[in-house]
């Protein structure tokens, strides 16, 4: 079946979220006078990432709100160094203000999207809020490629890997799932989720060399691999 549309994840697929989060938390802890209370800057970064990977899935499972998991991560990070805050929302927002000055798209994102223009429909399906991801895509210059075709779990009500959100993304493009590819950086949430929803699934593993096929998912090391679709 010919692929007529591609849906994209955003964080660590189109946008280098990991590098941005690293720079943001280091700048934030420095500004708060807390960085030297961690064993090392890298320890602070690793702990912040660990907390996100532990608490964010609880949001996806419906145990926490999107804002709630952010506030909890703030409280847990501070508790690790024996600190606290009366307003975890404001503490996280100060982190966001610093983090969001450093957003950058991966070098292969813009060339691919430009190459697809007029040939393949594109859209976004993301486990986040629409305002957040639209702002991010606008900052890095990629939003014009997507227009209104940005679907996020906070508004839709169901996150990846549930098939409903992938199928809603296909509807957004006006295409059946068998004519749509999905690419994201997480094997389970993106690769297996898209596969199980009936889309052609691509797992973006930037550490991979070349292209491979695994459990019905195509593994690619760069977005450039999609230019041949």
Show which residues each predicted segment covers.
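Glycine-centered short loops/turns at secondary-structure junctions
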Residues: 119-120, 198
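Asp-based, Mg2+/Mn2+-dependent phosphohydrolase catalytic module
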Residues: 1-6, 18-19, 114, 125-229
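Catalytic-core regions built around general acid/base machinery
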Residues: 108-119
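N-terminal helical cap/lid subdomain that shapes the substrate entry/recognition surface
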Residues: 2-107
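Short glycine/serine/threonine-biased micro-segments
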Residues: 60, 121, 182
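Residue-level marker of alpha-helix boundaries and capping positions
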Residues: 65, 103, 124, 181-182
């Amino acid at each position: 079946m010919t692929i007529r549309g591609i849906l994209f994840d955003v964080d660590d697929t189109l946008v280098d979220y990991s590098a941005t989060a690293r720079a943001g938390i280091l700048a934030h802890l420095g500004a708060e006078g807390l960085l030297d209370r961690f064993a090392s800057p890298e320890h602070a970064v690793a702990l912040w990432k660990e907390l996100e990977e532990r608490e964010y899935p609880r949001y996806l499972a419906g145990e926490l709100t999107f804002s709630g998991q952010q506030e909890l991560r703030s409280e847990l990070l501070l508790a690790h160094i024996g600190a606290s805050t009366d307003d975890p929302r404001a503490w996280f927002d100060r982190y966001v203000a610093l983090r969001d000055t450093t957003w950058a798209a991966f070098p292969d994102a813009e060339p691919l999207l430009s190459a697809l223009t007029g040939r393949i429909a594109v859209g976004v399906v993301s486990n986040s809020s629409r305002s957040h991801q639209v702002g991010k895509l606008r900052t890095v210059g990629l939003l014009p490629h997507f227009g209104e075709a940005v679907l996020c779990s906070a508004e839709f009500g169901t996150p990846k890997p549930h098939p409903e959100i992938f199928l809603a993304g296909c509807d957004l493009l006006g295409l059946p799932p068998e004519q749509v590819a999905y690419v994201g950086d997480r094997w389970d949430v993106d690769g297996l989720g898209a596969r199980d929803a009936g889309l052609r699934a691509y797992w973006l593993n930037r550490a991979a060399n070349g292209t491979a096929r695994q459990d019905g998912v195509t593994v690619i090391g760069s977005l450039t691999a999609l230019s041949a679709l």
